Curated annotation (Swiss-Prot):
It comes from the Bacteria. It comes from Teredinibacter turnerae (strain ATCC 39867 / T7901). Pathway: Carbohydrate degradation; pentose phosphate pathway; D-ribose 5-phosphate from D-ribulose 5-phosphate (non-oxidative stage): step 1/1. Catalyzes the reversible conversion of ribose-5-phosphate to ribulose 5-phosphate. This is Ribose-5-phosphate isomerase A. InterPro entries: NagB/RpiA_transferase-like (IPR037171), Ribose5P_isomerase_typA_subgr (IPR020672), Ribose5P_isomerase_type_A (IPR004788). The gene is rpiA.
Amino acid sequence: MNQQELKQAVAQAAVDYILPKLESDTILGIGTGSTAALFIDALAQHKGLFQGAVSSSEASARQLEGHGIPVYDLNEVDRLVAYVDGADEANARLQLIKGGGAALTREKIVTACADEFVCIADESKWVPVLGKFPLPVEVIPMARSFVARELVKMGGSPEHRHGCTTDNGNHILDVHGLEIHQPAELESAINQIPGVVTNGLFALRPADVLLLGTNDGVKTLYPHS
């Protein structure tokens, strides 16, 4: 299978995984990106089985609404049964790099509110060590240059993602050249830099389950310590 077919297979597997959890009052958290978009399309076939969704981006919200799935503001919701989203990289502990679509802050917030984080990805995203994919860092615009200098001190090579403004009105620095052997520690350290909103490491709150699309079928993986 090509990459698109792998993504479609894992999106359908995610729907199959979620279906037993759905009740009439269930609200799901739904992420952003190409694999999440395929999940939304597949989930729409079952929109009568649950109440609605909270989206981590304006783009996903528009897609959900286009399918007739009610979209709620997170402040209106007490509980999310699950959050389903893709990843740019994943390791054996199900620690992730996310944010290629610039929605990392909202993704991290919605993840924190969910009972379960279900990550969906194709096998090209499975890595032994995080960092080959540039690590996105969302920054307040006035702090961009300062944060970039601090990231250089940490061993990275930050690059301003020109033409990209997040849904929150901020900028993205993509940090190249990192081999991230201690993801949780680096996530915390970067978030301590004044001007950083958050970064794309999901290590302090990793995925609970990873549905990984491979040529041998979709594998269901859990964190390995």
